[in-house]
Regions:
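Short aromatic-glycine-(Arg/Gly/Cys) micro-motifs in beta-strand/loop hairpins
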Residues: 1-21
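Short, mixed-charge low-complexity intrinsically disordered segments
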Residues: 37-87
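A short, exposed loop/beta-hairpin motif centered on an aromatic-Gly-Thr core
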Residues: 16-33
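Short, flexible coil/linker segments at or flanking structured domains
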Residues: 10-16, 27, 52-54, 68
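Generic detector of N-terminal low-structure segments
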Residues: 6, 27-30, 41, 73
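Serine/threonine-rich, low-complexity intrinsically disordered segments
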Residues: 7, 11, 24, 29, ...
Length: 87
C-alpha cells in the first residue's frame, strides 16, 4: 500500500531548516490537496505580515513555496514504503 507524507519545512535567516509538520495521506492527490489548503492560508498570513510586494509563491509538481525577505516556507509530498510493501 502506498502512502504519502506531506512535509512542511520552514527555513529562515535566523534558524536552520526545521520540519514543522508531517502528515500521512493515502494518495498523492489527497496530500497535495491538503498542501494547497495550508499553502493558501499561510500565504494570506504572510502577505498581511510582510506586505504583498515582499512575498512570492511558486508551485511545482509536488512542491509549494512561499518566499519572503528572510524565510522560505515549503510543502512537499513524499512517497513512502510501508511495511506491507517490503514483504
Amino acid at each position: 500500500m502506498k502512502q504519502f507524507i506531506l512535509e512542511n519545512i520552514c527555513m529562515s535567516d535566523m534558524s536552520a531548516p526545521s520540519v514543522c509538520s508531517t502528515d500521512r495521506f493515502p494518495t498523492f492527490e489527497s496530500a497535495m490537496e491538503e498542501a494547497h489548503k495550508q499553502f493558501k492560508e499561510e500565504a494570506k498570513t504572510y502577505r498581511k505580515s510582510y506586505g504583498a510586494d515582499n512575498i512570492t509563491t511558486e508551485e511545482c509538481y509536488r512542491d509549494l513555496y512561499i518566499k519572503g525577505p528572510d524565510f522560505i516556507d515549503w510543502w512537499t509530498a513524499v512517497e513512502v514504503t510501508t511495511a506491507e510493501e517490503e514483504d
